[in-house]
Each structure stands twice: as structure tokens, then as C-alpha cells.
Amino acid sequence: MLPRPLRLLWDASPPGGVVLSSFRSRDPEEGGGPGGRGVGGGQEEEEEEEEDEAPVSVWDEEEDGATFTVTSRQYRPLDPLAPTPPPRSSRRLRAGTLEALVRHLLDARTSGADVTFTPAFLATHRAFTSTPALLGLVADRLEALESHPTDELERTIGVATSVLSTWLASHPEDFGSEVKGQLDRLESFLLRTGYAAGEGVGGGSADLIRNLRFRVDPQAPDLPKPLALPGDPPADPTDVLVFLADHLAEQLTLLDAELFLHLVPSQCLGSLWGHRDRPGHSHLCPSVRATVTQFNKVAGAVVSSVLGATSAGEGPGEVTIRPLRPPQRARLLEKWIRVAEECRLLRNFSSVYAVVSALQSSPIHRLRAAWGEATRDSLRVFSSLCQIFSEEDNYSQSRELLLQEVKLQPSLESNSKKAPRSGSGSRGGGVVPYLGTFLKDLVMLDAASKDELENGYINFDKRRKEFAVLSELRRLQNECRGYDLRPDPDIQQWLRGLRPLTEAQSHRVSCEVEPPGTSDPPAPRVLRPTLVVSQWTEVLGSVGGPTPLVSWDRPSVGGEEVPGTPAPLLTRLAQHMKWPSVSSLDSALESTPYLHSLADPSHLSPPASSPRPSRGHRRSASCGSPLSGGAEGASKGTEYRGGGSGPGASDCRIIRVQMELGEDGSVYKSILVTSQDKAPSVISRVLKKNNRDSAVASEYELVQLLPGERELTIPPSANVFYAMDGASHDFLLRQRRRPSTATLGLTSSPSASGTPPSEGGGGSFPRIKATGRKIARALF
């Protein structure tokens, strides 16, 4: 052992001056870590430099029907006086006949010299042979060694047992009923040679045969779940507005993750997937077909909902079309963009691309009027999502993003701005890639490289490249197991009930919605002046009689409102009223006023029980027209909202209604309530959802459950959206106790029951209230 001072001076010595006789590892805190340099570390670095500088020789060798690539490295010793060691060589099988590949597979030297051969061979063998044929060649090889020395036979049987065990564990789908004959042959060989029982190699062989028997025996096929059951009624695609975007994204992710976990990577090979449409190949790649079908299902749901059409068959006339206006279609576009954004946060790239590709498809992309009504924020998000899946540089952006998501997955989940919801539990940290990228890579690999060389040998270098792609899929499948999502029966039933349109049907409906040549290019958005109503009394005080009206599309001059005429006012009110959501259009579309022109005075009716704002209420209204910035005006414009509207409130809400079902207990149903829904229609929908007769809706009353065990009874003629209290979204549907119960009141609060909410802040302004009634009577 050298003294410590000499060991520390070793690094400063000239090269070759001192020969290291021994060393000891140092603690990192003493300078042996990254900040310092220990003796052992210096030797390792110098050895690495020597390896990098070592000359490399590469050549091919042919042996027994196989071509090997030999790589030789000549390393120089650290001591120039030491003898030169022999070169280090490694062999990799590059090509060969099928029999030569099987011999190399069962060679005991392969596992140490060519570590990637066995997994690559097992994953890609279906591209050049079948499983029964391969098992037959394995049996042939073992039977050929039966007359060889016992140690060689035992060594080969041990390798074969290890290979078959790995094969069964990593690719169980390869062992079906078609391999039963070859399995019987292997079992009889092991029994004949005495390796089917006992310990050691015999015990492993016996366990292997037992496991193979269990797998090969007839059992129920593991088929993907049907996307639509025969008895399911067709769903309305526009009902997507009923569901929250994050909840819908979670359910799409749940379905995509389940399919991706059941994906068989070897079925993605270009030689299999690329020939799927050939006659007699319809049974190939079932797991890939299921994933692609789900992708097309999501894309079809986007197209059907935006077009407002449901398919009843494949014929051109078997389509039910719901009449929608461009602003309503814009709400549907924005909804799907939000769903895609939520899927992006969940790292579900499959559904993100399904939604984006559907919105980029010709039937949707050509709807200029609808896109012109979409908000700027939605268009900005959509543009960023399109950039992710740009085809530039072979989807380089999506590939890099997927790689980053996998690396940063734990930190991304912990720092996510989306907190887990109690209803669905923790989201987890899984990843669902877009499978089309990998399918394209494998198809291109299959087309770019030959399956066989000029001499007829199987090109195994091609299979190694394919195996690299399949290994990436395997790794992503392990990452996909990190999700923790729960199914939502309502959303999944809606997804199952969707009937997507065919390509021809989509194009025809799109041309009916906007005939070619009738849609002008969307004009650039123009920032319009904003009107601020500081006090409600200013509006009513500026009205001197039933005819003078307030102009809502011009800014205030000197703090006073400029009066307008009745006809322009109705037109401007029609422009600034928020368009109804599609889901508010119940089954009776023909009777809904919003299906007609909103500029028609006969269809502008005030809500039945709209609470009046207080004196100090302030409200801003965006004054854009429907064709230029109208969507922003709709989302930020003047609205009346009942029950204490807050930031982000809109013209629809989702409430939970509990209905007592006698001995069956009680259930909750989620109902979408819009600004046009009155109590009878809401009660009827609740009864229908609970499989009750909606004709007896008059026998029930709707009660809002408020904090503090209070109740708010909704009158039969009231508009539920405006009458409800914003403090709670829980309701109770019960049989009417007293027919006279028609007064809005808080049953548990004496102070609240004294003054109905309809008196609001106007109880001290009787003249203003009377004037307001006159205005409403004159206008409507």
C-alpha cells in the first residue's frame, strides 16, 4: 500500500510516471464526489479515454446459414511497458435463414454476447413466420440434440425453457389453440428424455408445460368491449354541452388508457398493420383496430355534434339534422376545444389529436360563420394544439413533447394547476400516446428496408429497428398504468349511444348548413366600445315614456345615455342577447323561440321571475355584433343571472336534483338548466330521467336545498335559472304538499321569508318599478 501523500500526488504525476498498485474509495464529502476527484475516479476516467481512443474494426462473418457482424476493439494498456492484451470482439447476428435464427436463439452464448437478439426475435417473429412453425423448429432442434452428449442437451433444454418462459410472459397472446399440436410434441420429448419432472432443468420444464397448457386450453376470448350496444338508443351529439369539459376528458382518457394497455405491440408491425386491408386479413391486429376505432369514434362525435346531425344508417338521407345557428355551433366548437385542452392536461394525446383532427376536417373547417363566432381565447388554444400535432419534421413537436411528459411526469402532476376532484378521485400520472405516430414509423420502416437479403437470408437488422419502436410502446404502456380515474355511467352511456356520420354524410350536411359560396371569409375582429351601466336607475331614469329607449350599441356621451328608436333597439338587443346553448333546446325544437330570428320582437320575452338588480349594481356590456366579435360579446356581454352570478357564470347551470323513490330510496340526477327553462319543463325532465311519467309533473314541486337546512320552493311559473339561489345547486323533487304553494320563500329563515327575492333592491323605488313594468309591457 502506498503512503497517503504519494496516493494524493498520483494525479499530478506525468503520464506513465507512477504505476498504481492499489486504491481505496473515498467519501464524497471528502472530495471524492463531483467536486473533487478521487484516485479510483481518475483511473476510471483515464480508462474511458483509452476506450474511446481504441481503434475499432468491423467486418462480416458467415457461418451455417447466418451472417454475423463482428466488432473488434484493440485497447492500449495504461502501462506502456505492459504487454498488449488481445482484442475484444463481439458478434451480432445480422441476417440468416429461419433455421439459423432458431439455432442462435437456443445457443447458450447468445444471452451474453447478443443481449437484444432474444427479445427482438420474440417480438417480431410474426413478420417472417408463425408461432406454430417456430415452435416446430424449436422441437426439431431439441430432437436433433437427443443423441448428443448429456451436458450439451441439458444446457440447450435449459436455454429453451428460459426462452419459452420469457416468450409466455411477454407475449401470451401468441399461445392460442393453434399451437396445441406443437405443445404436445414438446411435452412428449421432455417426457421421453426425462426432463419433464424432477428438480433443476426438469422442474422448470414441468412448470413451463403446465403454464403453457393453462394458456392454450380453450377459454373465453379477450375481445374489446363494444362501443355501442345494440339496445342503446341513439344519443344526441349536441348533449356534449351537458357535461363538464374536464369530466368528459377524464372519461375519454379512461377509455383510451384501457385500450392502450390491452394493445399488443407486435400487432403494430408494418408487415401486419400495413396489410390489414388485404383479403383474408380482417382478423389481424384486433387490439390496434380497437384503438383506431375509438379514435375515429371521438373524431366522429366532434363532427356530429358541431353539425348537429345524427346518423340513422349509411344512406345519404338517413340523417337527422338539428337546426343550429352559427353562434350555437361556435359554443360547440369552444366546448370541444376545452375538452381537448383538458385531455392535454391529462397527457391523453390520442383524444387531443382526435378532437383536433376532427375540427380540422373539411366538413368543420369550412364552417366560416361558426368559426367567426368563436372567442379569441378558444381560437388561440386551438392554434396551440394544432402546432403540437403539426406534421412538420415527421411530428417532431409531438414526439419531443411526449418525451418531456414522460420524463417530467411526477413533477408535472404535483405542480398541476388542476386539483383532483372529489367526484373522480386523483387523476394519477399516466400517459396515452397517439398511436398513429408509431404505426407510421413501423410502416415506413417496413417499406424502407427489405425483408430478405439478396441471398434469401432474413434481414434481422430490420427487425432490431422495429423492436426499438415496439420497446418504446412497451415503456409507454407501463407509464399508462399511472392513471386513477373512475367511470361515469352517464358520459359513457352517451358515448356508446353516439352514431357518427359517414364521410359522405358529413360533407353533405356541412354543405346544407353553409352552402358553398355563401360564406364570406371571417372579417377581422374589431374592438367595439364598451358601455358601462353604473346604476340601474340611470337606465330607467332616462326613459320618459313608453317610446324613448336606451341605445345599447353606442358609448355613453358625457355620462348620459343617448336615446334611440324602438326598432333599432330591438335589433341591437337581438345582437347582444346571449345565444342559447344547444342543450337548452329540448325535444320540441319547433316551439323554441331561438330557432327563429332573434331580431323578431315576438320572440324576445323577459324571464318570468327575473330578480331585479340592486341600486348599486354595475354591469359592462361588450358591444360587438354577432358577425364580428359576437362570440366575445356573448361570453362577456350583458346577461341577467339569477342567484348571485359570479365570475365565469353563463346562461346555463348544472343542478343536482334528488327524487324520493319510496322504498327504493332516493337518487340524484344531474340536469342542465338554461335561462329559458321554467319549473314545469325541469320537473318533466327529472321525471323522465327517473323513468317516471312526465304527464304528472303538475303534482310535483321543485325545492332548492340551501345551507343551514333551509329550503327555497320554486313557483310553478318561475324561471328556475333566475329564481334559484347561487349558493347551492342541490334540489329536491317531491310531491306537492299544498296546491297554494306558489310563493317564493325561504322556509327556515324568518328574516328571509319576510321579503321575497323578487323585491330585491327595488322595494324602495315603487315609481321605478312601475316605470319598468310599463317599459316591458310596451316593448314585449
Curated annotation (Swiss-Prot):
The record describes the protein's role as: Probable guanine nucleotide exchange factor. Putative effector of Ras and/or Rap. Associates with the GTP-bound form of Rap 1A and H-Ras in vitro.
Q: Which residues carry this modification: Phosphoserine?
A: S13
Keyword Kinase carried by entry: no
UniProt keyword Transferase, yes or no: no
Q: Tell me the Gene3D superfamilies matching this sequence.
A: Phosphatidylinositol 3-kinase Catalytic Subunit, Chain A, domain 1 (3.10.20.90), Ras guanine-nucleotide exchange factors catalytic domain (1.10.840.10), Son of sevenless (SoS) protein Chain: S domain 1 (1.20.870.10)
- Give me any GO biological process, just one: small GTPase-mediated signal transduction
Q: Where is the composition biased (Gly residues)?
A: 31-42
Outline the extent of the N-terminal Ras-GEF domain: 89-213
Please name the GO terms that the record assigns under molecular function. guanyl-nucleotide exchange factor activity
Where does the record place the Ras-GEF domain? 244-516
Composition bias (Acidic residues) maps to 43-65
Ranges of biased composition (kind: Low complexity): 596-613, 741-758
Disordered, as annotated region: 1-92, 596-651, 741-769
**What are the Ras-associating domain coordinates in residue numbering?**
651-738
Its protein name is Ral guanine nucleotide dissociation stimulator-like 2
Going by the UniProt record, its keywords in alphabetical order are: Guanine-nucleotide releasing factor, Phosphoprotein
What SUPFAM superfamilies does the database record attribute to this sequence? Ras GEF, Ubiquitin-like
Q: How does it assemble?
A: Interacts with SAMD9.
What cystine linkages occur within this chain?
none
Q: Which gene encodes it?
A: RGL2
